[in-house]
């Protein structure tokens, strides 16, 4: 199997959580004996190469972040430039986001399920997983803990010939977190997590508090 992976995030590679997820997933592909090539669309200068790879290959995976229940506008623009193919080409998706509950990604998943029909290609499934926000703010060791499971999904993609519904469901985690856990998370965000975000914001160059409201 030879797979073309296209990172549909508008964020540059250096700061892209999606790119780090692709790193792990691609390792899994390689472990299962597959080959792959990778492209990003955050810079329009890469579009011609990515489009050519899409045109010349039949196993395509788009990896993307969830933005406000839908996919990035830049990726939609890229889709509009793609040529019409046939169902010999299979398109699959990796949809990731910061929300911990799988239900938060369902709207985006439903859209992606319909998209291959408009591209005139076959659909290979959508792997969804939330709770990925921390990838950008934690240590390298902790990043590997978050992205490590994607390596197994890459291996499974080859061995199972695509994303299988039962595996996707198990990987995505709970649709809704239990009430006690929600309460605990709310407390964490008001205490430990808040301090962490304050530290990170200063490291990123923020000059005002994280709860600053310039419109007031």
Feature locations, PLM:
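Short flexible/disordered coil segments
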Residues: 96-109, 125, 152-164, 186-205
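N-terminal beta1-alpha1-beta2 submodule of the flavodoxin-like/Rossmannoid cofactor-binding fold
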Residues: 1-85, 162-216
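A conserved mid-domain beta-alpha-beta active-site/ligand-binding segment of alpha/beta enzyme cores
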Residues: 126-189
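Alpha-helix capping at helix-to-loop junctions
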Residues: 84, 118-121, 159
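Low-complexity, flexible helical/coil segments
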Residues: 38-44, 74-77, 92-101, 125-133, ...
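A glycine-biased structural micro-motif
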Residues: 87-89
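Short, glycine-/small-residue-rich phosphate/pyrophosphate-handling segment
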Residues: 91-145
């Amino acid at each position: 199997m030879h797979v073309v992976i296209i990172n549909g995030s508008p964020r540059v590679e250096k700061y892209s959580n999606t790119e780090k997820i692709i790193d792990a997933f691609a390792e899994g592909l390689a472990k299962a004996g597959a080959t792959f090539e990778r492209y990003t669309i955050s810079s329009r200068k890469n579009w011609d190469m990515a489009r050519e790879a899409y045109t010349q290959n039949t196993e395509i995976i788009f990896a993307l972040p969830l933005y406000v229940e839908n996919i990035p506008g830049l990726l939609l623009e890229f889709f509009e430039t793609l040529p019409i193919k046939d169902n010999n080409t299979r398109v699959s998706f990796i949809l990731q986001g910061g929300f911990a509950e799988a239900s938060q990604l369902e709207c985006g998943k439903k859209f992606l399920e319909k998209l291959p029909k408009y591209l005139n290609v076959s659909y290979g499934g959508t792997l969804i997983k939330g709770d990925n926000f921390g990838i950008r703010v934690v240590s390298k060791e902790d990043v590997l803990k978050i992205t490590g499971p994607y390596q197994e999904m890459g291996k499974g993609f080859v061995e199972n010939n695509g994303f299988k519904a039962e595996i996707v469901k198990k990987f995505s985690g709970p649709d809704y977190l239990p009430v006690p856990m929600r309460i605990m998370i709310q407390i964490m965000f008001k205490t430990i997590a808040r301090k962490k975000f304050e530290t990170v914001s200063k490291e990123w160059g923020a000059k005002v508090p994280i709860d600053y409201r310039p419109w007031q």
